[in-house]
Amino acid sequence: MQTLANPSKTPINQAVFDTTIHRRKTRSVKVGDITIGGGHPVVVQSMINEDTLDIERSVAAIRRLHEIGCEIVRVTVPSIAHAKSLGEIKQKLAETYKPVPLVADVHHNGMKIALEVAKQVDKVRINPGLYVFEKPQAERNEYTQAEFEEIGDKIRQTLKPLVVSLRDQNKAMRIGVNHGSLSERMLFTYGDTPEGMVESALEFIKICESLKYYNLVISLKASRVPVMLAAYRLMVKRMDELGMPYPLHLGVTEAGDGDYGRVKSTAGIGTLLAEGIGDTIRVSLTEAPEKEIPVCYSILQALGLRKTMVEYVACPSCGRTLFNLENVLHEVREATKHLTGLDIAVMGCIVNGPGEMADADYGYVGKQSGYISLYRGREEIKKVHESQGVEELINLIKADGRWVEP
């Protein structure tokens, strides 16, 4: 019997408490000049909301996203006319800006559209539940095995020309399952479940593999975080069992807007990334697409997967705080937010400050009323009046050769 005096001797597996995220090993998939998977940095994506028939507005929207860090841009393609416009969009980007990796989003009965866009873009996204759309029958209550397989054969015949086209051009495809648009036969067979989502994706993957096409990225999105988490985890389990090391595109679809939309997306995307699952992400907000990009990079930075901005460490303030912490943090952030690769700590007092900011490159710590101490790592460099604190912090960073002008 285990007691406090006689604790268990079972050895602790230190790997369980490793502070490094060990990412799932996946194959590399090229999308234009960006690589998804294969150990490359997690890629940030978004989607424009312009009508792609409007060439000028679409080019401007793609450029706005790319300039703020969106590495792959998706566009919707509801018709053949839209598909043909993508060639002109891609050409105008190259002439007036630079090439940007583009993904075409294809849905209902999209074979002809997909074949056209495959000539124009770097990746095609298809939705297995809608690519070969079977109109629901109100009187149906089941699918026989023969009926299930018959539709499977139709899917293969419809998908094959696109797979061959992308394979021969060495372009990519995303098999993008949505919880809200599973096909009727998957719903009858597996229910409205993560299992149904996974089986829907696997059916399309197996068709691609049978045609020796492997440039695949997989997604299983849902608007409810628990469903999304379960689907991705089950997908990883099944792919590992089947030897399918395909990269995963993470997202919570229809997350909404504001704080809750950001929290909801972070709960889903961040949880999986922390488990080593995920190679590219999109935060879907009911806001301007440009507002999605900072959320993506913040998630990646918080998990230590990509460092693209200053990491600020700051205490929540308490009765020991010797200056207006909120105002000072704002001043420090405004002065240094253009820098990259630095950790800067702003701490209210010396009780916990030096210890809790030990990993920071620079520290700004309340010393006594009216004065603060500046640190380089663990070393206290100088004590200055708080009115000079931000200016002297900048001077310290400059002295170390780590400052760049905004």
From Swiss-Prot:
Q: Which cofactor does it need?
A: [4Fe-4S] cluster
Q: Which Pfam families does UniProt cross-reference here? A: GcpE (PF04551)
Catalytic activity reported: (2E)-4-hydroxy-3-methylbut-2-enyl diphosphate + 2 oxidized [2Fe-2S]-[ferredoxin] + H2O = 2-C-methyl-D-erythritol 2,4-cyclic diphosphate + 2 reduced [2Fe-2S]-[ferredoxin] + H(+)
Question: Which residues does the record give as [4Fe-4S] cluster binding sites?
Answer: C315, C318, C349, E356
Which pathway does the UniProt entry assign to this protein?
Answer: Isoprenoid biosynthesis; isopentenyl diphosphate biosynthesis via DXP pathway; isopentenyl diphosphate from 1-deoxy-D-xylulose 5-phosphate: step 5/6
Q: Which domain of life, per UniProt?
A: Bacteria
User: Disulphide bridges in this chain?
Assistant: none
What EC identifiers does the entry list? 1.17.7.1
**Keyword entries, A-Z:** 4Fe-4S, Iron, Iron-sulfur, Isoprene biosynthesis, Metal-binding, Oxidoreductase
**What does the note under cofactor report?**
Binds 1 [4Fe-4S] cluster.
Gene Ontology biological process terms in this record? isopentenyl diphosphate biosynthetic process, methylerythritol 4-phosphate pathway; terpenoid biosynthetic process
Q: Tell me one GO molecular function of this protein.
A: iron ion binding
Q: Which NCBIfam families match?
A: ispG_gcpE (TIGR00612), PRK00366.1 (NF001540)
In the record, the note on similarity to other proteins reads: Belongs to the IspG family.
PANTHER family given for it?
4-HYDROXY-3-METHYLBUT-2-EN-1-YL DIPHOSPHATE SYNTHASE, 4-HYDROXY-3-METHYLBUT-2-EN-1-YL DIPHOSPHATE SYNTHASE (FERREDOXIN), CHLOROPLASTIC
Q: What does this protein do?
A: Converts 2C-methyl-D-erythritol 2,4-cyclodiphosphate (ME-2,4cPP) into 1-hydroxy-2-methyl-2-(E)-butenyl 4-diphosphate.
* Record-given protein name: 4-hydroxy-3-methylbut-2-en-1-yl diphosphate synthase (ferredoxin)
Q: Which source organism does the UniProt entry give?
A: Trichodesmium erythraeum (strain IMS101)
